[in-house]
């Protein structure tokens, strides 16, 4: 069964008084363990499609199923619960709290996750990911003192800390140098 199923979704926005179609009749299936890349030029609707897939936005038409559950028509509380259960996000602008340390930022999703682990287990996961992404020495550093690439890697770790089944990444390597974008 598909973990994420997007069927004929469309989304329009109003730009002043003009209706702009950001996504038109898109469909895709993603199975557990699959990696899918959506590519296209700036302004082609990639971020909007990710927001539809991650149930941040509701489609104007079409349907979205997450782990076989239809998302269309769910109230805000149920949509939020589903997002927290299934999705990790890496957004273009990192969405990190500047005054907090990298570690504090990484731990934010654990406050909302139903998949509670022990503090020791979270430390083990963070240590492993930070080592792989070469930011072990930055975990106690305030985010405002990190480079763009370091912030990006902290955002990547944050998206993975709760073992989410689906990671949605909007330009996840945009701030990384060539060496680190391969990791």
Task: Give the role of each language-model region.
Residues 62-70:
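Conserved ABC transporter NBD signature motif
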Residues 99-109:
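Short coil-to-helix segment of the ABC ATPase nucleotide-binding domain corresponding to the Q-loop/switch region
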Residues 167-170:
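Catalytic Walker B motif of ABC-type/P-loop ATPase nucleotide-binding domains
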Residues 142-146, 150:
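Conserved ABC ATPase signature
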Residues 54:
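Helix-to-loop junction immediately C-terminal to a conserved catalytic motif
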Residues 70, 119-138:
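Conserved ABC ATPase "signature" region
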